[in-house]
Curated annotation (Swiss-Prot):
Organism superkingdom: Eukaryota
Protein name from the UniProt record: Riparin-5.1
Tissues/organs with expression: Expressed by the skin glands.
Residues with the Glycine amide modification: G16
GO terms, biological process: defense response
GO cellular component, one term: extracellular region
Length: 16
């Protein structure tokens, strides 16, 4: 799973 900052930079989304 790779976590990356969202467009707004508020939270980190997890994508795997």
């Amino acid at each position: 799973i790779v976590s990356y900052p969202d467009d707004a930079g508020e939270h980190a989304h997890k994508m795997g």
